[in-house]
Regions:
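Conserved N-terminal/central alpha/beta ligand/cofactor-binding core
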Residues: 21-125, 140, 152-169, 176, ...
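A glycine-rich dinucleotide-binding beta-alpha-beta segment and adjacent secondary-structure elements
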Residues: 306-372, 400-413, 539-593, 598
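An anion/pyrophosphate-binding glycine-rich loop and adjacent beta-alpha core
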Residues: 36-38, 54, 182-320, 417-490, ...
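Conserved beta-strand-loop-beta-strand element in the redox core of flavoprotein oxidoreductases
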Residues: 127-143
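Beta1/beta-strand and adjacent pyrophosphate-binding region of the FAD-binding site
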Residues: 2-15
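Short hydrophobic core segments
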Residues: 10, 143-154
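Extended, charge-enriched "interface" segments that sit outside catalytic cores
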Residues: 430, 436, 447-617, 621-624
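Core beta-strand elements of the Rossmann-like FAD/NAD(P) dinucleotide-binding domain
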Residues: 3-5, 139-148
Length: 625
């Protein structure tokens, strides 16, 4: 068996799979090592991918040449585009996935990736010499050497699970924790944190009264995650269901609070603010008499259902008593209880934007070990870490994404610049340039970068350039075409809109919120002919992208100017220029933060909490700007 590799990836969750796949496809001999090979890319919590801002990350991963979008599309049992009622910057794709099919699809991807090897074992130590990582040692007593290591251990570092008073060591139910790594890195100067997450009980759908639920079906249109055509699920589609808690449920939960590990001191670590447990909800929102819950299928053929919104670490008897006060769940049977898990993580400000450690060369960290929460956030980090591990091995240029280029760029910049004091989840509100970071144009933003690296294929690159050309042609046609009033007025009046008094450019006509290209084409045979000339499989995608470009042109152009101005500060290098402890013109807090984080650029420095605009102005003066 081979024992020497270019890159070793520790942990085969969502971050690890993307990291290993990227490094191997770029040409590095890569070892992916995991505690249980039957649980590669396991969805430890909800059986879904995407959602608000998270869906944009998945599309960015796909555009760069990563795999999560493809795997998700192939295992999907329901797809929806969230936030349709808002502007396109907020549209976020989400897929309900078959949990087991998701694992099988990832396993196929990994096993068919050249240069990628897998091994089932637990890593206990890194081999570090002279501040450089050289490999790993395992629980079986084996040593594997490498030029780079990516740590993607998820919730497994000294993981401890809680169901009421019962505490069980583990990174996930039935899987042991990973020990030794935290202690070694702490001794090397890594700042260690402790965080908590949780998961709800799983229910038997045969014991649910669906007549008491609100049905929620998926959408049957052209949207999906991968930009590659023909990537789709062969699985039957399934609905989700909505139910609500009530005061009886809350009363049971309140009586159980003294037994809750969250409220009796058993759990002391910090949980995710935006995914609170049900006991946290009834305490934090004490005035609310009801909370919405989603009953989500775990797969196409299983009876197991996931109760989204009811994460809990209460004793099981309290959980089930509370559930049975929900009308649809009066006779419910459960397959497994909800539980909480505590785990170790590290301060991400001790990383560079490539996710390489500042303390140990060629050691990269990605995923929940950096204090994030969510499959998508982990996968995005894993992709960047895997790319840069390969770049380090081969002497290539570091690969990073700016805040105005990708949500992945926002995510990593937030982590390494601001750090985390609670599990970090991505939202559209975190991206100041979100109108430029839409889900529909991730390929046009990033595929050329992925192709330049060698990660995105020529097929993917040519599809992107063909799409761009078709959009440009359709936009040009809209600008050049004048629509006669008598040709369009019958359609306008039939749809309750003000008729034209004279001809108007098609481009300007499209600015009306009620109008879209497909509707106008019903009255204009020439426009219909333009649409018929587009490849049928991509026509809806081209139309949607064209409408966004036309209707939101002013916003996009304005935001581009703002982003360009901000980017100038990111082009002013700070690294190695100052001993911040000696700059007494800036505030004490700024000195301490700048010394600790050592930002690469003035732009990054300006985003550090505690560094004021006046501090930045002083730095610019000292730089001679």
């Amino acid at each position: 068996m081979r024992t020497d590799y270019d890159v070793i990836v520790v942990g085969a969750g969502h971050a690890g799979c993307e990291a290993a796949c990227a490094a191997a496809r770029l040409g590095s001999h890569t070892l992916l090592i995991t505690i249980d090979m039957n649980k590669i890319a396991q969805m430890s919590c909800n059986p879904a991918v995407g959602g608000i801002a998270k869906g944009q990350i998945v599309r960015e991963i796909d555009a760069l040449g990563g795999q999560m979008g493809i795997v998700t599309d192939r295992s999907s049992i329901q797809f929806r585009m969230l936030n349709r009622s808002k502007g396109p910057a907020m549209w976020s794709p989400r897929s309900q996935s078959d949990r087991q099919q998701f694992i099988l699809e990832w396993r196929q991807v990994l096993e068919n990736t050249p240069n990628l090897y897998m091994w089932q074992d637990s890593v206990t130590q890194f081999v570090i010499e002279g501040g450089v990582v050289k490999g790993i040692t395992t629980a079986l007593g084996l040593t594997f050497t490498s030029r780079a290591v990516v740590l993607t251990a998820g919730t497994f570092l000294n993981g401890l699970m809680h169901v009421g008073p019962v505490k069980t060591p583990g990174g996930r139910v039935s899987e042991p924790p990973a020990t030794g790594i935290t202690e070694q890195l702490r001794d090397l100067g890594f700042t260690v944190g402790r965080m908590k997450t949780g998961t709800p009980p799983r229910l038997d759908e045969r014991t649910i009264d669906f007549s008491q639920c609100i049905r929620q079906d998926g959408e049957q249109d052209f949207h999906h995650f991968s930009f590659l055509p023909g990537v789709k699920s062969a699985l039957p589609q399934r609905p989700c269901w909505i139910v609500h808690t009530n005061e009886q449920v809350h009363e049971v939960l309140r009586k159980g609070l003294p037994q809750s590990p969250l409220y009796n001191g058993q759990i002391t670590s910090i949980g995710p603010r935006y995914c609170p447990s049900i006991e946290t909800k009834i305490v934090t929102f004490a005035d609310k008499t009801s909370h919405q819950l989603f009953i989500e299928p775990e797969g196409a053929t299983t009876h197991e259902m996931y109760l989204n919104g009811f994460s809990s670490s209460l004793p099981w008897e309290v959980q089930i008593e509370a559930l049975r006060h929900i009308p649809a769940l009066r006779d419910v049977h459960a397959f497994r209880p909800g539980y909480a898990i505590e785990y170790d993580c590290f301060d991400p400000t001790q990383l560079t934007h490539t996710l390489e450690s500042k303390l140990v060369k060629n050691l990269f960290l990605a995923g929940q070990v950096n204090g994030t929460t969510g499959y998508e956030e982990a996968a995005g980090q894993g992709l960047i870490a895997g790319i840069n591990a390969h770049q380090n091995v081969t002497g290539g240029e570091p690969f990073t994404l700016a805040r105005n280029e990708a949500y992945i760029g926002v995510l990593i910049d937030d982590l390494v610049t601001c750090g985390v004091d609670e599990p970090y989840r991505m939202f559209t509100s975190r991206a100041e340039h979100r109108i430029l970071l839409r889900q529909d144009d991730a390929d046009m933003r990033l595929t050329e970068k992925g192709y330049g690296l060698g990660l995105a294929t020529r097929e993917r690159y040519e599809l992107m350039t063909a799409k761009r050309e078709q959009i440009d042609r359709l936009i040009a046609y809209c600008r050049q075409t004048t629509v006669k009033a008598n040709a369009i007025n019958p359609l306008l009046q039939a749809n309750g809109m003000q008729p034209l008094t004279q001809g108007q450019r098609l481009h300007d006509l499209l600015l009306r919120p009620q109008l879209n290209i497909s509707l106008i084409a019903q009255a204009l045979p020439e426009l219909r002919a333009q649409l018929d000339a587009i490849e049928p499989a991509r026509c809806d995608e081209i139309i949607e992208a064209t409408e966004v470009a036309v209707k939101y042109r002013g916003y996009i152009e304005r935001e581009t100017l703002i982003a360009d101005r901000v980017a100038r500060l990111d082009n002013v290098t700070l690294k190695g220029k100052f001993d911040y402890s000696q700059i007494h013109q800036i505030s004490t807090e700024a000195r301490q933060k700048l010394q600790a984080i050592d930002p690469d650029t003035v732009g990054q420095a300006s985003r550090i909490p505690g560094v004021s605009p006046s501090d930045i102005n002083i730095l610019l003066v000292l730089l001679g700007r």
